[in-house]
């Protein structure tokens, strides 16, 4: 599946294995580049849906991953892979109720 956004100047590409659309990967291509400088690959990020965004982010933090954009809204967070790729984590279904410690966490770096 492909979705063009003229106003936002980006394209979303949704990839899934044949006959298994439940394991979908979203690729974001920014038409004007991503302004990340040298070594940039001109795409925005990878996005994954998870069953519980708070549990997922806690597990990532417990394993040394920096949560660059905490899930303050119970719906969306961002981290970076070891090689600098931005990864969006999305709550499957409705957003969870906002809760601590996420609600008070500041953004770290860029995502």
For the regions a language model picked out, list residue spans one by one.
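Vicinal oxygen chelate
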Residues: 19-22, 29-86, 91
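Intrinsic-disorder/low-complexity coil detector
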Residues: 17, 69-70, 97-100
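A short, acidic/glycine-rich surface segment
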Residues: 1, 10-11, 30-37, 97-98
